[in-house]
Amino acid sequence: MESFVAMKVVCITVLFVIVAVNESATSEANTSNAAKDTKKTNVTLQFPNYIPNPKQLALKLLEICKNNKSSLNSLTARSSTNYYAINDKYVDFKYYTFLCKHDKDRNVTLNMPPDTPCGPNGQKCANKSQCVGHIPGC
C-alpha cells in the first residue's frame, strides 16, 4: 500500500513538472511574439495632430533615450543591457519632456529636441513659454 501511495506522489510530481515546463515554453513564445509585434510598421502613436510625422518623432525620442542610457552606463558600473523604451502616453508637449525607460525598474525624464513642435501654431520646444501641450479629446 505504501508503494502505491509513493507511486501516486511521483506521478503527481511528474505531472506538475510537465505542466510547469509547458507553461514556461508558452510564456517564452508569447514574449518573443510580443517583441516581434513592436517591430510592425502599423503602430498608432497618440501624439497631437500638430506633430507632422509621429513615427519620426518617436524614433528621435528613442534615439535620445538610447544615447542617454549609453552615457549613464559609461558613468556607472550598471549592466549595459540594450533595453530602452519610450511610451507615447508619457510625452508631455506642454513641458517638452518625455519618459525614457532604461530597465524594467528604472525611468528617467528627458527633454525633447528644441525643434519639436509643441503647439498647433508652429510653436517649438525651443521657446518653452509658448508650448500648449496636448488636451485629450481636442
From Swiss-Prot:
Q: Where is this region: CD4-binding?
A: 119-138
According to its UniProt record, where is this protein located?
A: Secreted
Residues annotated as signal peptide: 1-21
| Induction behaviour | By feeding. By the presence of Borrelia burgdorferi.
The record's keywords, sorted A to Z, are: Glycoprotein, Secreted, Signal
InterPro entries recorded:
Salp15 (IPR021971)
Q: Which residues are glycosylated?
A: N30, N42, N68, N107, N127
Name the tissues where it is expressed.
Expressed in salivary glands.
CC terms in the record's Gene Ontology section: extracellular region
Describe, as the record does, how this protein assembles with itself and its partners.
Answer: Interacts with host CD4. Interacts with host DC-SIGN (CD209). Interacts with Borrelia outer surface protein C (OspC).
Q: Which family does it belong to?
A: Belongs to the salp15 family.
What role is this protein assigned? Salivary tick protein that downregulates host immune system by binding to both dendritic cells, and CD4(+) T cells. Specifically binds to the CD4 coreceptor on T cells. This interaction prevents the activation of the Src kinase, Lck, and its downstream substrate Zap-70, and results in deficient activation of PLCgamma1, the repression of calcium fluxes triggered by T-cell antigen receptor (TCR) ligation, and a subsequent reduction in interleukin-2 production.
Protein name per UniProt: Salivary protein 15 Iper-3
Organism encoding this protein:
Ixodes persulcatus
